[in-house]
């Protein structure tokens, strides 16, 4: 949710970084705590006290990927992963196991604050829709998306999507049969302008495509239109 004072937990073994980020985010209106190992981080993230977690990959006692895997068994707490710059594999794995976004180190604290707010706005949207019965269900080609309950069924079977994947699918289903530009998806879902060096949108789409699976004839439901965007195909 997005409140006047969102509570953030930083899980990173770099105490100096935790202190610097905490100071900046506090000025930006967040309430920030930090822990310095994976086991303590998982316990904090599962405590129900926080609105979001900032999670480093390299941690003592339990690495960030294992923290996230265990967290996702019990919680949908939004998570931004801190990854090594240039390490695409860390980013891919993080998004595959349920991170909402990633930010490579070193990063600009202003960018981190912007990412936090964007994700918290999505979470706030989830809650407001969950209390409303006015948002219409979208049903296309065996895929049924219900905004009010945040449930997606594929041929009658529920699939588990992150908040980003859900919003991407909603955008594509709403324009089924039409190409949706990458720039538009980035601005409407990720809430930032598309960067030539930011592959997070591609990774989210790839994960969404895997979760949706192929049709009975083996064709993909979502296709990439090179250098333009994506299309939810119709049969």
Name each model-derived stretch.
Residues 7, 118-179, 183:
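Short, Lys/Arg-enriched segments at the junction into DNA-binding effector domains
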Residues 12, 36, 59:
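Conserved acidic carboxylate
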Residues 16-27:
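Charged docking surfaces used in two-component/phosphorelay signaling
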Residues 29-37, 44:
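Short hydrophobic/Thr-rich beta-strand motif most characteristic of the beta2 strand and flanking loop
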Residues 49-51, 74-79, 195:
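His-Asp phosphorelay/catalytic-motif detector in bacterial-type signaling
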Residues 49-54, 59:
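Active-site beta3 strand of CheY-like receiver
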Residues 61-63, 69, 73, 78-139:
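Basic, amphipathic DNA-recognition helix from helix-turn-helix-like DNA-binding domains
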Residues 151-221, 225-228:
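Positively charged, aromatic-enriched patches within helix-turn-helix-type DNA-binding elements
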């Amino acid at each position: 949710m997005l409140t006047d004072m969102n509570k953030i937990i930083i899980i990173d073994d770099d105490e100096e970084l935790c202190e610097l980020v905490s100071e900046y985010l506090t000025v930006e209106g967040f309430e920030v705590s930090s822990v310095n190992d994976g086991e303590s981080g998982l316990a904090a993230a599962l405590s129900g006290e926080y609105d979001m977690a900032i999670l480093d990959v390299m941690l003592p006692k339990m690495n960030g990927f294992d923290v996230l895997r265990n967290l996702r068994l019990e919680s949908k707490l939004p998570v931004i992963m801190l990854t090594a710059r240039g390490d695409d594999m860390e980013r891919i794995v993080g998004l595959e196991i349920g991170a909402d976004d990633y930010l490579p180190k070193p990063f600009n604290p202003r960018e981190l604050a912007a990412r936090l707010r964007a994700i918290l706005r999505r979470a706030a949207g989830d809650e407001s829709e969950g209390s409303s019965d006015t948002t219409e269900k979208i049903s296309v080609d065996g895929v049924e998306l219900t905004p009010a309950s945040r449930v997606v069924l594929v041929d009658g079977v529920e699939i588990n999507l992150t908040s980003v994947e859900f919003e991407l699918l909603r955008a594509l289903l709403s324009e089924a049969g039409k190409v949706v530009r990458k720039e538009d998806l980035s601005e409407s879902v990720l809430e930032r302008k598309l960067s030539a060096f930011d592959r997070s949108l591609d990774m989210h789409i790839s994960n969404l495509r895997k979760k949706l699976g192929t049709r009975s004839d083996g064709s993909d439901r979502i296709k990439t239109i090179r250098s333009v965007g994506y299309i939810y195909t119709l049969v």
